Each structure stands twice: as structure tokens, then as C-alpha cells.
Amino acid sequence: MARKAKAAKKSDNGAKVGFEDTLWLAADKLRNNLDAAEYKHVVLGLIFLKYISDAFEERHQELLAEVEQGADPEDPDEYLAENIFWVPPEARWSALQANAKQPTIGKKVDDAMVAIERDNKRLKGVLPKDYGRPALDKQRLGELIDLIGTIGLGDKENRSKDILGRVYEYFLSQFASAEGKKGGQF
């Protein structure tokens, strides 16, 4: 166990950051009757949403502390100036996690993706929006949202270490293995 924890901390040299295996096991368990080619979009979309929500929330807290100096935490330009996507209230991770146990969680995630694309033109047409489909078990989707919610992805420290890129790389290799393909063949 100590050796495993030690290996997980070696994140500055490109090694695993420590939580990918946990996420992968959850994703694999939660995927239910979907194959890896379909489920990768579900998982990677949620990871991206958590990443931008974390970055947004960190900047939001900074702006709240600077209100007396004229900062406006509800002005999207305050975020864009720092290369952070604006995340509308209904699309913030906290709102999704608060509804993770609801049978409508799939629709709420779809609506969050639509809202993010609406307010961030650079993301228009890019985000997955099929979380409400019947084949996706909503209870398991909620469990995955809760699990991803325990991991900090988009704060400044993790952004500087390219955590998102490393998590995506890890997941793509795992999805490729699950499909019996080599990485890059998606």
C-alpha cells in the first residue's frame, strides 16, 4: 500500500497522478451494457465538465474576494480574461452533483453541456449531449458523477501539471485496451 501511494505521488514526471485507476474501475463497473467505444464519451465528457467547473469555481472564489475592488463574479469576461470557460449556474458541477441521485440526471447533464456550448462559442458543437439516452443507467451515471466529484481536476495547481491531458491520455489507453485496439485507433 505504501509503495502504491508513493507511486501515485510521482505526478511531476508524467507518471500516474493517483486517481486514474479508481476512475477507470468505476467507469468500467458503471458502463453496464455500453461498450467502451460508447462509454468513453460519457466518462471523458464528465471529466471535462468537472475540469472546467473546478477552474471556474476557483476563479469565482477569487472574484468574490475582490468584489470591493470592482470584480464581478457574474461577468463571463472576468473568466475569459484568465482563459477559463464561463460555466452557467445550471451547468456547474455542484448543481449536477446535487442532482446526481435524481432519475433526470442524464437530462440535467445534457442541459449543462448545451448551456456551456451556448455561453462559450469555442465549444459550440463539441461536447457530448447524449446522457439522457435510455441505454445509460441513470443510477450508475449518478454514482460516476459523485465519484468524479471527489477529485480536484481544474484548480491552478492541477492545470499547471496538465492533469486533464494526463487523465485523458490514461483513459484513452484504457478504452483502447477495453476494445482490444491500440491507442490512437479510436
Predicted regions and their residues:
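Non-catalytic, mostly N-terminal accessory regions of nucleic-acid modification and defense proteins
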Residues: 1-186
